[in-house]
Design a protein with these regions (language model features):
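Metal-dependent polysaccharide deacetylase catalytic core of the NodB/CE4 family, i.e.
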Residues: 164-184, 188, 234, 241-248, ...
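C-terminal motif of bacterial Sec signal peptides marking the signal peptidase cleavage site
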Residues: 23-26
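C-terminal active-site subregion of NodB/CE4 polysaccharide deacetylases
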Residues: 119, 125-221, 234-251, 259-262, ...
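N-terminal secretory signal peptides that target proteins for export/translocation
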Residues: 1-9
Length: 509
């Protein structure tokens, strides 16, 4: 009897080899158009899907394949082997890739950001002009897109048709600490009537902004044009704003920080900080000196920084200055140097400051004034001695006006704006004429804009060679009148009940 166990494994190997040979032969015949003989059939399974042979152990082995077009040369069964070669393409049919624009430089980014800020403040022409100062701006897509954007926004603005319907609001120096201001002394009464607290001012600014109010310069309302014959004519300006925006003028009376206000919770002067910003110096009750946004000027500056659309072309407001205690908190009046005609407040201040340097005081005041003007503020005369120009003699009016020019304009620069002390207009509400001696003298002194006090929403009078505008006091007495039911003069601007500082003594009389 034959022992078949010793043949089993070699037989299996031979069958696998036979099948492999048959497969190779079949491939060769197919390429030459032949056919397989009948004996090619075998009990060995061939996977039609995988291209693998399965031997009788159940294990699969890859089927070698030939490279297409090259009989007898085997290749891996990767799909990459069967990828069609790319079609030939002539150089005429190939297109050049479009050049990629380089990223913006830091300088270009800064330029566009500054132009965007100008446009946010409605100065579209200045924004476009700034972009066009960049060499090659037309090749920078971000810049050309900005120009289109500014042009479209400019086209969407509308002209404010009636300059007679532009309101003017004003404040005095703001109360920083109501506890000190309303301490029951002799000054509390006036502080409560005619002053506004810092917190009230912040709320008023925000609510007016929310209602669409935009700061404008009084020079935007109207301006002087010199005619061919040399005569001057005041002509209306053109204010263009987006639909729904409302222009208004702001002014501040007496930011000179008088001696009587010392220790009563007000700032003591304006200074320039390390960033070049105008801020307030404030002396706390313990004598500690701190700096910050404690009055109208720095508060408006910060507000406009955060909301560029709150200001038309950078306008801020008008600072109405006297001169008898100096300007902006600096003791610049000649009396501080020559010690002539000193009042009690001046004497006490000089005694407390033996290191006082008059020339340095003048220099610092000029620096602050220039910084204010550069940031959009304008100056006005408020008379030298806070005098009533309607009631004083013509002689005294002339002396006061000349003294203001010599002691104040010499520091802050010339101005064409006069804001009457006490709101006392030289001619009531009647138009100015050449027969009015006071008006003609003030015109000779260079004044073209004249502002009184008027509680009504609007008082704007365009004369042949002047502009008059009434100003509305946003202070304790007006707010109290509104919330106590007497008369609400302020409802078009803000809700007095939401603004009124609870630390104020009431009633406000």
């Amino acid at each position: 009897m034959i022992d078949t166990r010793r043949w089993r494994k070699p037989l299996r190997i031979n069958i696998a080899a036979l099948v492999l040979c048959l497969c190779l032969t079949a491939c060769s015949i197919r390429q030459t158009g032949g056919s397989l003989p009948d004996e090619s059939t075998d009990t060995t399974e061939e996977s039609e899907l995988s291209g693998e042979l399965i031997d009788d152990t159940g294990e699969s082995e890859p089927v070698p394949t030939e490279t297409p077009g090259k009989p007898g040369v085997t290749a891996e069964t990767s799909t990459e082997s069967f990828t069609e070669p790319p079609a030939e393409t002539s150089t005429e049919e190939m297109t050049e890739p479009e050049p990629t624009e380089p990223p913006l430089t830091d300088a270009q980014v800064a330029l566009i950001e500054e132009a965007d800020r100008l446009a946010a403040g409605y100065d579209y022409d200045a924004a476009m002009a700034l972009i066009q100062t960049h060499e090659g701006f037309a090749e920078v897509s971000a810049m050309t897109e900005a120009l289109v954007r500014y042009e479209n926004r400019k086209a969407a603005t509308v002209k404010w048709e009636s300059i007679e319907e532009i309101t003017h609001v004003f404040y005095h120096s703001l109360i920083v600490d109501p506890v000190l201001a309303f301490d029951g002394d002799e000054d509390e009464y006036n502080y409560n009537r005619v002053m506004t607290t810092v917190e009230e001012f912040k709320k008023i600014m925000q609510e007016m902004y929310d209602r669409g109010y935009v700061l404008v310069s009084i020079h935007d309302i109207a301006h002087i044009e010199v005619q061919a014959d040399g005569s001057e004519v005041m002509v209306p300006g053109e204010i263009r704003l987006p639909e729904g925006k409302i222009p208004y003028v702001l002014s501040v009376d007496d930011p000179s920080y008088y001696h009587y206000m010392e220790g009563d919770g007000f700032a003591s002067r304006l200074v320039i900080d390390e960033m070049g910003n105008v801020v307030c110096e404030y002396i706390q009750p313990d004598g500690t000196v701190v700096y910050g946004d404690f009055d109208v000027m720095p508060l408006v500056d910060r507000f406009v920084e955060a909301h560029p659309d709150a200001s038309y072309r950078g306008a801020k407001g008008i600072l109405a200055l006297t001169g008898y205690h100096g300007v902006l908190g600096y003791r610049t009046d000649p009396a501080y140097q020559n010690h002539q005609g000193l009042d009690a407040g001046q004497q006490a201040w000089l005694a407390a400051h033996p290191e006082f340097d008059y020339e340095k005081e003048i220099e610092e005041a000029k620096r602050v004034a220039e910084a204010l003007k550069a940031s959009g503020w304008e100056f006005a005369s408020h008379s030298y001695g806070h005098r009533n120009y309607r009631d004083i003699s013509m002689h005294d009016l002339m002396w006061d006006s000349n003294t203001w020019r010599n002691t104040v304009a010499s520091i802050i620069g010339e101005t064409d704006i006069l804001i009457y002390a006490y709101g006392a207009d030289i001619n009531g509400t009647s138009p100015y004429t050449a027969e009015n001696e006071r008006f003609m003298y003030l015109k000779e002194m260079g004044f073209d804009y004249f502002c009184n006090v008027d509680a009504n929403r609007y008082f704007v009078q365009l004369g042949d060679n002047y502009l008059r505008q009434g100003r509305r006091n946003l202070d304790g007495i007006r707010m109290w009148q509104a919330i106590s039911g007497q008369k609400d003069w302020l409802s078009d601007l803000f809700d007095a009940g939401e603004v009124f500082d609870p630390e104020r003594p009431t009633p406000v009389r």
